[in-house]
Amino acid sequence: MNTTSQQYDAIISICRELYSKKMKDYGCAWRILRLPSLTDQIFIKAQRIRSLQENEVRKVDEDEASEFIGIINYCIMALIQIDKGIADQPDLNFEEGIRLYDEKVALTKALMENKNHDYGEAWREMRVSSLTDLILQKLLRVKQIEDNKGKTLVSEGIDANYQDMINYSVFAMILMGKDNE
């Protein structure tokens, strides 16, 4: 049986491959997006997942997994934006874009491992729909923090919320068996 760390890496490998291909196709055009724009893109993906979970009929041939991949990659882009700021023009070459991606993944995986140790892998007993709801809750929190110009009184910042959404998405994909594909 794979360890959580190995399963995590397998999911991230799928996401990184798509990110890499899109970087080759489009460059880093996403660097012009402000954080609320990225948050809205993530929200659209999460709402779509919830809709797929609730509806039997699908009119677009995409599944939950592709939307979770989108959430992961958009959250990583948001973490990069937090550190680098918004660019007026695309300003990252392919290698730098991949390096920053890997850096954000490493930090987020370390957070997961620390929380996983403390919570005893409780996520393994959760439903994918519950993880989707937690992602939507995090998005509502992020939107509120953005509306408050990034200020919080007692809560964690936007970056921690993006990291949690990445980890919840990875967990959902593991529960769906996508780490074995």
Where are these regions (language model features)?
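Intrinsically disordered, low-complexity regulatory regions
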Residues: M1-E181
